[in-house]
Curated annotation (Swiss-Prot):
Keywords: Ribonucleoprotein, Ribosomal protein, RNA-binding, rRNA-binding. Pfam families: Ribosomal_L4 (PF00573). GO terms for cellular component: ribonucleoprotein complex; ribosome. The keyword Ribonucleoprotein applies. The lineage of its organism: Bacteria, Bacillati, Bacillota, Bacilli, Lactobacillales. Transmembrane segments: none annotated. It comes from Streptococcus equi subsp. zooepidemicus (strain MGCS10565). One of its GO terms (biological process) is translation. Residues 49-78 are annotated as: Disordered. Belongs to the universal ribosomal protein uL4 family. The gene is rplD. GO terms for molecular function: rRNA binding; structural constituent of ribosome. This is Large ribosomal subunit protein uL4. InterPro entries: Ribosomal_uL4 (IPR002136), Ribosomal_uL4-like (IPR013005), Ribosomal_uL4_dom_sf (IPR023574).
Amino acid sequence: MANVKLFDQTGKEVSTVELNDAIFGIEPNESVVFDVVISQRASLRQGTHAVKNRSAVSGGGRKPWRQKGTGRARQGSIRSPQWRGGGVVFGPTPRSYGYKLPQKVRRLALKSVYSAKVAEDKFVAVESLSFAAPKTAEFAKVLSALSIDTKVLVLVEEGNEFAALSARNLPNVAVATAATASVLDIVSADKLLVTKEAISTIEEVLA
């Protein structure tokens, strides 16, 4: 099993933590990661685009002129697509762009991105992130002590609200629970800051 250094909130190395090689030590599958990221980005699309077809455009209920005898081309409605102000043909309608990939694929993608972060030395383990109250300055001190000055995703255990509240005003810092962090969240960050309890949660979820 791979070992990573374990720090406290002051940036002092206190021990090491063993990582499960089946989760944090596999050969990253870039193709699977790509597929999952595309899927998750597609799910974020609003899909609220819409146009009016000939049935939705106001007016046009009356035939503009009689069928025969005028010498003009026959028309049934002034809201037909060929008319100015008419309806749109085959335009976009509201829809969901989301689609689901198999659970095995999603799990492999998570293992791949975690393994990549560990291999690239972009995985920082911290004993805990506990705050007496939500304080942005206190969280900033922790990041400074750990020499983290790039875009970071902080993974905490369920129920650690003060950590999330303390970090939300900091630029380039995102907080998620270990059980709900997505592949897109992880690949979007330069580094991962993970609590010891969150590591255990990740290993439980992906075991």
